[in-house]
Amino acid sequence: VLFRSNLSMSALLDNGDEVLVPAPDYPLWTACVTLAGGTAVHYICDEQSEWYPDIEDIKKKITDKTKAIVIINPNNPTGALYPREVLQQIVDVAREHELMIFSDEIYDRLVMDDYEHVSIASLAPDLFCVTFSGLSKSHMIAGYRIGWMVLSGNKALGKDYIEGLNMLSNMRLCSNVPAQSIVQTALGGYQSVGEYIVPGGRIYEQREYVYKALNDIPGISAVKPRSEERRVGK
């Protein structure tokens, strides 16, 4: 996702343009916006509300320079999983202000407790969305550097942006063909990650242990993450 997030911001931003980024955030999103000449404007994700985005805070931070909003769902670093109704509110705001949506969904296969992951692009067929995912987390092969970005929705709104992406992508000359040869097998074959995210599985049990250990410390609280084993406490 890192290379593609950098690519996606470089193709979009002029100096001074703004992108809404969640806080707390995966810091490389802020870095990619900054490196592209933009300004990362952080919107609040509130622990008291299961770490969901504060929609009113998002609205307050939109200006005439705002070009896009980034969401990370499932979230890194909080482990929050955004429900359909929260995603719909974000879509409504993006539609009203004509914002592009960038959705980092690299943890979408690591959802626990029978919760459902909803891709925000499925709720916004009329908007231009860029969705990121890959095999690093779900298949535990980060060293292969296999990831992808999916452009969906109203591509007429992103014609110039797509041209910019193609130009920047061509500068890479070639992809990692040997690594890419495993994608079909990885996605279509046996999915071992399912054993890790259920009771008895390593990721599930790590989450349970750390969640309890944190909350057992006086003065420390943590919201139980719904995806992978990350957590943020206070």
Residue ranges with predicted function:
Residues 41, 46-113:
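Active-site phosphate-binding strand-loop segment of PLP-dependent enzymes
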Residues 122-201, 211-213:
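Conserved core segment of the aminotransferase class I/II
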Residues 36, 96-97, 127:
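Helix C-cap/helix->beta junction micro-motif
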Residues 1-2, 233:
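Short, small-residue-biased leader/transition segments that mark boundaries at the very start
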Residues 34-41:
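A short helix-loop-beta submotif of the ANL/AMP-binding
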Residues 3-18:
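Phosphate-binding glycine-rich loop
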Residues 184, 200-211, 221-231:
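Conserved glycine-rich beta-strand-loop-beta hairpin in the small C-terminal domain of fold type I
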